[in-house]
Amino acid sequence: YRTYETPGDAVRNATRLVEAGADAVKFEGIKPDILDALRKEGITVMCHIGLNPQHEQEEMKRGRIARGKRLDEAARLIEGAALLQAHGAGLMILEKIPEKVSKIITENLGIPTIGIGAGKYCDGQVLIVHDLLGINERKFKHCPDYIDHRAMMITAFARYRREIDGGIFPAEKHANIIDDAEYRSVVEWCAASGYTV
């Protein structure tokens, strides 16, 4: 977040990531100037269009999540995807775009598209792990209810607390045990060294 406000910021931060072992970087939005600067440095770039969750938190809170449902938005996304490909994008992430619009984008690009809530016509799919595992309280239309880890975690934490409060945990089976003879040696050493046992 806020690591690519200018082309210089983008290059500086992306270079650090690549030096640390990243194979590529990703940024949100239709920003050919940022893409040009990164590609000039030989950095592989994945672009992310549609919903830009790092920059649109307030709109998301108001419930406006899908992008491309109106002609002007759909046209901007289709043209933006083509523009980013022309500037060297290696992959396009399409987030919360209507399935039919994602199909048009995918069919008009020569690079892979990865959808997150963008329908079945993308070349691949991705979900946020917290959504996939049901860890977040908020549920999203594009993510099936595979499992409710949130409820499982709440149950586990409540049990953990009850067992601590009730003196059940930790039990002897959870403790590391020292040999009696070795412990006597520790006690003798403590006495000789001024430690209370």
Where do the language-model regions lie?
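Alpha/beta enzyme core
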Residues: 1-197
